[in-house]
Design a protein with these regions (language model features):
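N-terminal secretion-targeting helices of virulence/extracellular proteins
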Residues: 1-167
């Protein structure tokens, strides 16, 4: 199954959870049937029922009880696997939402710092031409640092996003 790199959290957690619940319910039903068959075996005492038909019933019912127990175990295992998978998908969805917010914040910060740096660069050029203070140059250098930090934040978000994609694969 390929993972959509643009949406690593894609999946219906509710649907997966519902499928897990259905299998857990099926396991309960199978265990109830197992208990009923086991009770029927116990009730088929030699005092009540004798002969070959009783023996055939005991053999068949015992085999049925074993099969019901096996099927209940399989349904429980499927329910557990689906529940674990649903939790994993939800965890990825939650992390994806956090990363999307971090990306949006870093992108907005980057755009703001670039605009502010351009303004500071223009002011610094003017200030240098007239021999004024170096405040604008210092602001430009500060914005350059903030731009680098925002770009590093975006790179970290991209790396974490790729980790999500890998986790889902």
């Amino acid at each position: 199954v390929s993972v959509d790199a643009a949406d690593p959290g894609r999946g219906d957690v509710g649907g997966i959870t519902a499928a897990a619940s259905l299998r857990a319910s099926r396991a309960t039903t199978l265990r109830t049937a197992h208990d009923q068959v086991t009770a029927a075996i116990a009730e088929a005492s030699p005092e009540v029922w004798t002969g070959q038909s009783r023996e055939a019933f005991i053999v068949g019912a015992t085999a049925l009880a074993a099969e019901l127990s096996t099927l209940a175990g399989q349904a429980d295992a499927e329910a557990s696997a689906l529940s674990t998978y649903a939790q994993g998908v939800q965890s990825i969805k939650d992390e994806q939402a956090r990363l999307e917010l971090r990306r949006a914040d870093a992108t907005a910060d980057l755009a703001l710092y670039k605009r502010q740096k351009r303004t500071a660069d223009i002011e610094a050029t003017t200030d240098m031409a007239i021999g004024a203070s170096t405040d604008a140059q210092e602001r430009s250098a500060t914005y350059a640092d903030w731009i680098a930090q925002s770009e590093a934040d975006l790179a970290a978000v991209d790396a974490a996003w790729q980790d999500l994609v890998s986790d889902r694969e």
